[in-house]
Structures are given as structure tokens and as C-alpha cells.
Amino acid sequence: MLVETKARVGVFAIALGAYLPQFPTLVPEFEGQYAAFKKTLPDTVEVIDGGIVTTKEQSMAAGDKFRAADVDLVILQLLTYATSYNMLPAVRDLDVPVVLVNVQKKKAPDYANTDTPTWLGELYACGAVGEMVADLERA
């Protein structure tokens, strides 16, 4: 008898928490980007939502959720720059593949009319990918 099951995919997004008090408009921007990203995931998987992580404690909570669900894969959306402490507690000890998603939100920046929150929220393809990959390899 064939039993249909769905892969369990842990999904979360990260951003540097220090940006949020400085640029409060980033919060709804990141929430919108994360919601749109989750909608791209197929119905053929069970999504375990770790939320938007901006602190080590939130990362630990996401990791606890992923471990409890026994996820098969983790997908991490990099919303803007973040340090690896936002990532590692969520994925350490899972022994599953981790996919980093890092996409610039706008095709062509209007540099003359871009302010810091716009740069951080919509235009910055995360420069921390190298740091994340190096830390994943060491973890």
C-alpha cells in the first residue's frame, strides 16, 4: 500500500535586528517579502514556519520547531545583511540540507532616489552569503 507523505520543509528568513529600530519601515517590508516568498513554495510540501529571525533567541526557537517537526530540508531567505548567529542556532544539529535564498528585490535600482531603508529592504542582495556558507561548512 502506497502512503502519500509530504516532505517537511523548515522555512525562515533572517535580517539584522539592529536595523529594525533604526529603520522601522523595514518591518512591514520584510514581512511582505517573507509572505510572498512562502507563497512560492509548492503545496506538495509541509511548511514548518520558523518566522522572521532577527535575534539568536528567535533562531533557537525556529530550530526547536524544526527539530520537533523532524524537517527534511531547511530553506533560509536572506532579507538583508545578517550575521550567522541569526542562522546557526536554527540549523545546527539538524543534519539536513540548507538552501540559502538571496535575491535582490528590484531589477534596476534608482540610485539617485534611494535612501538607506530602501537599500537595505529592497536592493541589497545579501553580502553575508559567504559568511553563512563558511559557517554552515564548519557547523
Language model features: what each stretch is:
Residues 1-139:
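Metallocofactor- and cofactor-centric catalytic cores in central/energy metabolism, strongly enriched
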